[in-house]
Swiss-Prot record:
Pfam family, one: Ribosomal_S5_C
Domain S5 DRBM span(s) in chain numbering: 18-81
This protein's domain notes: The N-terminal domain interacts with the head of the 30S subunit; the C-terminal domain interacts with the body and contacts protein S4. The interaction surface between S4 and S5 is involved in control of translational fidelity.
Family, as annotated: Belongs to the universal ribosomal protein uS5 family.
Gene: rpsE
Functional description taken from the UniProt entry: With S4 and S12 plays an important role in translational accuracy. Located at the back of the 30S subunit body where it stabilizes the conformation of the head with respect to the body.
GO cellular component: small ribosomal subunit
Subunit structure: Part of the 30S ribosomal subunit. Contacts proteins S4 and S8.
Keyword terms of this UniProt record: Ribonucleoprotein, Ribosomal protein, RNA-binding, rRNA-binding
GO terms for biological process, alphabetical: translation
Protein name according to UniProt: Small ribosomal subunit protein uS5
InterPro entries: Ribosomal_Su5_D2-typ_SF, Ribosomal_uS5, Ribosomal_uS5_bac-type, Ribosomal_uS5_C, Ribosomal_uS5_N, Ribosomal_uS5_N_CS, Ribsml_uS5_D2-typ_fold_subgr
Keyword DNA-binding: no
Lineage: superkingdom: Bacteria
Length: 176
């Protein structure tokens, strides 16, 4: 029996648990004897708005194929972001190449105050209050990798205590 793609057209695609956001599509060209050949690169972010987010860059001769490749890569590169009360647990600087991104926690009601790339990633990770500043190069790909570097290095107070071997002190009701 041969496989025919035309038979699959009416089958519903499975719904993903992740929301997706395409940050940008880049077109490159190579000149050959007969003319130019174009290729496309797509940067896609996937997230469940509940602490899980992934990023992928797909390259292909056509835009839809590049986007599908990017989604597939993003699913494989998922990370967990510790979200406490809608914000990140502490201030951190993410670095990639010459791009640095400062990520700061913010109080309730602040919202996500950030550039396009950090805002998209934070919102798909489920962060509702955060401050961000892009330092150095503002290349979208490098900024995205820098944000992911920052998110990967975030630790909750509980994780830090476990790493240091410290037990949590009981909270007493005030100064004595």
């Amino acid at each position: 029996m041969t496989f025919n793609r035309r038979n699959d057209r009416n089958v519903e695609r499975e719904t993903s648990e992740f929301e997706e956001k395409m940050l940008f599509v880049n077109r490159t060209s190579k000149t050959y004897q007969g003319g130019r050949r174009f290729r496309f690169a797509a940067l896609v972010i996937l997230g469940d708005r509940n602490g899980r987010v992934g990023m992928g860059i797909g390259k292909a001769k056509e835009v839809p194929v590049a986007i599908e490749k990017a989604k597939s890569i993003a699913r494989k590169n998922m990370i967990s972001v510790p979200v406490e009360n809608g914000t990140i647990p502490h201030e951190i600087v993410g670095v990639n190449s010459t791009s640095r991104v400062l990520l700061k926690p913010a109080g309730p009601g602040t919202g996500v105050i950030a550039g396009t790339v950090p805002r998209s990633i934070a919102e798909l990770a489920g962060i509702t209050n955060m401050l961000s500043k892009e330092l150095g190069s503002r290349n979208k790909v490098n900024v995205a990798y820098a944000v992911f570097d920052g998110f990967k290095n975030l630790r909750t107070a509980k994780q830090v205590r476990a790493l240091r071997g410290i037990e949590a002190a009981p909270v007493t009701g005030g100064a004595q």
